[in-house]
Amino acid sequence: MHLATRIAAFGIVMCSGASFVAGQDSSTFRFVFTEKPGQFGVGLRVVEQSDHSRTFQLEGGSSEKSADVGSPRPLQTLVWYPAPSSNNRTMTFGDYEALIKTETSFGMPVEDGKPQKFVESYMEGTTDLPAWAVRDAEMQPGRFPVVIYAPSLNAPATENIELCEYLASQGFVVIASPSMGATSRSMTVDIPGANAEAQDISFLIDFAVKLPDTDASEVAAAGYSWGGMTALLAAARDKRVDALISLDSSFVASGDIHPDQMTIPLLAFSRGDDTLEYSDSQRKDKTQCDCGPNVLNEWTHGDLLHVKLLATSHIQFSSLYQRSERFRKEAMQFSPADYSLEEGAVSYNWMARYTLEFLNAYLKHDDIAALFLKRTPAENGVPKHLMAISLRQASALSR
């Protein structure tokens, strides 16, 4: 299909087919990230930079104030990196929340507007929680593979704090910026919005190349929901991307995206109610959407690992959302039928583990990690009924 139709159908494809528990008590649920840190400490560096090739409308401190039009595109960049272990004060979730208020204003907090309301809603009850990263910590000597993380629609760069810090502790430099529209902070569900976030990914790769602790010859793009779709756009257009990770993204090919020509490995996580056949039937059912070939079905010339998390709903692919008080209040509508919120949290931890092993296998070329990916979930210790996996090896691309 044309990209315009693809974008219009995004919300329908993303949300369709879900079933939820109606009577689960969520008052005692507490999300716990149980994966252990790697051999490194974690540093966080915040870089306030701008893309002068694109213009942007800056928000004022009040919705009634006029905005600056024609300014360069601000990209508050969060860099998580391996650092020597230390006893220095670590970040709190509240420290991360404070960063979000200066996403586009760089040092001058914006106290209202859509991004701030979003943060206040989903960070309620989390501000005192300790994180792993030490702000501006010393860098660990060496060069490490790069992971560019693309957030979901209109989301801050911090929506998966645990995942980003976890990967940094395991020897990756993880870089993220907010999901923003083409000309303003609010993301738009259209072609310019999708292309803008994809361009941000390439901008961050340019930035990563200049860092003293990166191995820019090994780069992965990862994204959640809308961010996974924009990561696909970036990977198709920027040949520096060596691997792709999708966290429950709506993947349908269109425009200049040709999955049957892609040769990089893809790790695609999805909810249990999504299957390759279901997505393909959506494509063929013209009452649902007018879609191009399903990306996963057409991804034949790059390795494809498709991991279905059976106990997980779409919103549970973010640790930040699972931690929030709002999630606990509304959780009954989130958990898939016959599964508990605790099982959804366990599934998130396994998602982080499989992400790590995928990156180890394809960016660090680790044979043990490659074997992990080939084993069944049960052989890797995953509890029964939480995960289903299919691994399809790449076939040769005809020339």
Model-predicted segments: where are they?
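Alpha/beta-hydrolase active-site loop
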Residues: E159, D190-D213, L233
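Short substrate-entry loop that stabilizes the transition state in hydrolases
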Residues: D128-R185, T275-Y278
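Bacterial N-terminal signal peptides that target proteins for export
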Residues: M1-A8
